[in-house]
Design a protein with these regions (language model features):
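Bacterial Sec-dependent N-terminal signal peptides
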Residues: 2-44
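First exposed extracellular module after export/assembly in secreted or surface-exposed proteins
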Residues: 32-170
Length: 170
């Protein structure tokens, strides 16, 4: 009788051990980068900023852009940054920006931020775009700037017109 009781207790203990290791969390793991391709990495001394889009490139016209900030020391992606950006076109005699949205975090627990930029002009041999990204993490301010490729699009993707109020619209 003792032998059978020991076997039964051992079996129950093993069953409880396996049962307690199971997970009731049936929510699927979300891949933040699904359908996105990396465009470029912009670096400074502390972080690497990864730019993404659906096509993996920027072009003249409307561009929906996502980004992630990676800490160079820990290798972790930042989840609590406040991000702003400023695209600048450097021409022979002047510099100008273009229409852009704010940069917003996509999900509370995620690492991806997104916004859009409408490049009104394409780059050429002497004129180019750069993207300055200003961001704050836990009260500390950081900046990273890099030249970006903005070739002409195959089709017209942006147009401007003057409204009845004499304001120009894109």
């Amino acid at each position: 009788m003792k032998f059978k009781l020991k076997n039964i207790l051992a079996g129950v203990a093993i069953a409880l051990a396996f049962y307690s290791c199971s997970s009731d969390n049936d929510s699927p793991v979300v891949n933040e980068l699904a359908e996105l391709t990396k465009i470029k990495e912009i670096t400074n001394t502390t972080h690497t900023i990864e730019l993404y889009s659906r096509t993996g490139a920027l072009e003249q016209g409307y561009n929906n852009i996502s980004l992630r900030i990676k800490d160079k020391v820990s290798g972790d992606y930042v989840k609590n940054a406040t991000v702003n950006w400023m695209p600048l076109m450097h021409m022979a005699t002047k510099t100008h920006s273009c229409p852009k949205s704010g940069v917003e975090k996509i999900t509370t627990d995620g690492t991806l931020y997104k916004g859009n930029i409408v490049f009104q002009m394409a780059q050429n041999a002497t004129e180019y775009w750069d993207l300055k990204i200003d961001y704050n993490i836990n009260g500390a301010a950081f900046t990273a700037t890099s030249i970006i490729d903005v070739p002409a699009s195959a089709k017209q993707r942006v147009t401007t017109f003057t409204g009845a109020d004499n304001a120009r619209y894109i």
